[in-house]
Amino acid sequence: MARIAGIDLPREKRVEVGLTYIFGIGTSSAKKILKETGVNPDIRIKDLSEEEVNLLRDYINQNLKVEGDLRRDVALDIKRLKEIGSYRGIRHRRGLPVRGQKTKTNARTRKGPKKLVVSRKKK
């Protein structure tokens, strides 16, 4: 099993797809990595030689910010936005959409489940 950036990559997947299991690497980044290192993107992860795995691992460690480092940087960026009181920071603090989406009817993912308002019966 290939282990890159602390992640066990799935053995049966193609290398191009397997690299996307690492936080911070998408499909375009995976294609670029494979092109730069010269590894065949159609080969399965289980068929990679130890030399190719080390080549990928070294390239990712030297050139990309992935997993823990990237998560920490994103968290610090959000914390900074909250501290300076920017509009985006306020939206993060309130748990609302940050990028200008409408919130009258949608935004259930950010806002969470509906809070039911129970009206009392008048006597």
Curated annotation (Swiss-Prot):
Please provide the record's keywords in A-Z order. Ribonucleoprotein, Ribosomal protein, RNA-binding, rRNA-binding, tRNA-binding
**What domain of life does the native source organism fall in?**
Bacteria
**What biological-process terms (Gene Ontology) are attached?**
translation
Presence of the UniProt keyword Secreted in the record: no
Could you tell me which residues belong to the region Disordered?
92-123
Q: What family does the database annotate?
A: Belongs to the universal ribosomal protein uS13 family.
> Could you tell me what this protein is called?
Small ribosomal subunit protein uS13
| Species annotation | Clostridium tetani (strain Massachusetts / E88)
